Structures are given as structure tokens and as C-alpha cells.
Amino acid sequence: MEKLTATIIALNEERRLAACLESLRGVADEVVVVDSYSTDHTVAICHDYGCRVTQRHFDGFGAQRQYATSLASHRYILSIDADEVLSPALRESIIRLKEQGFAHRVYAISRLNFYCGYPVKHCGWYPDLQIRLFDKRYANWNLHDVGEKVIFRDSVRPEPVDGD
């Protein structure tokens, strides 16, 4: 079975982080959190879930994500925000990919956006495909301060993954 590292960048995420980490159980073999010196209980929650935590001053979203990727022990990276939760369908899809072996270098995941607590599945907001699962030997984050994206070393077509 393939191994997978989940990477998270965080700052003062104590209210949302536990749900994110709970959704990673049984999916991620390692969770790396790069914390930007939170002043709440973010780091303690990470330790409670067995995450590997490093603190680093924030110097842009792309740089933080790229640094988190560099700390990963495994080839395949699942980059997730601290306020995001894997759906049961996405969990099953990723577990199946791990069991069968990753056949692609880069995967696109549908992001379900919420507005005022309600999911938005119309007006072009869904599926909001995001490159979040990739082989770090062939892809990594650009260094944009905001609007960061995964860039590839060669021309690959992201494979969609079921679930959001």
C-alpha cells in the first residue's frame, strides 16, 4: 500500500482543526502541520492527533505550503486547509488509490464551497477543482503570497478523484 502525507498550514485554527484532523484518520500515514505561531490551542490539538508540528513565521501561502511539502516523509502529498474536511466519498477514493497504487502524478479534488453555512453547488462554484493530491517529485506549490497553485515539472493532466 502506498503511503501518504497530509500537509496543513495553520494559524489560530483551534475551532476547526479537530474536524479536519479527524477526517484524515485512516487516510494519511503522516500529518505535517506548519503553524505560524498560533496563540490559541492549535499546536496542542495537533499534538493530541499525533501530528508533526513545525512553527515558522508566515511568509506567504505558497512558501508555507512548499515548506510543508518539503517536510513530508512520503512521496504523495495531500494538501488540506485547516478548515477543510474530507467527505466520506473522498476518504474512500483516497484509500482506494493508496491500496491500488497511485497511477498518476497529480490529482484534482472537487472543493465544495460554503456561503453563510450553506453548500454552493451552482453558479460555477462546484465542482471547484483543486490540485491537492500530488507526487512531490513532479509537482509542488508556486511561491505566490496568495492565489498559490500547484505547478508541475512536466506536462501532466490532473486525474479527478471522486468526492469533495
Question: Can you describe what each PLM-predicted range is?
Answer:
Residues 1-23:
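N-proximal low-complexity "stem/linker" segments adjacent to membrane-targeting elements
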Residues 3, 29-30:
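Residues at the starts of beta-strands that form the adenosine-phosphate
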Residues 18, 40-49, 89-90:
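Acidic helix N-cap motif at the loop->helix transition within catalytic regions
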Residues 23, 27, 33-44, 81:
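A conserved acidic beta->alpha catalytic loop
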Residues 29, 43-71:
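Conserved donor nucleotide-binding strand/loop of the catalytic core
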Residues 56, 80-82:
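Cofactor-binding loops of NAD(P)H-dependent oxidoreductases
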Residues 63-69, 75-80, 87-164:
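Catalytic-site signature of metal-activated, phosphate-bearing donor transferases
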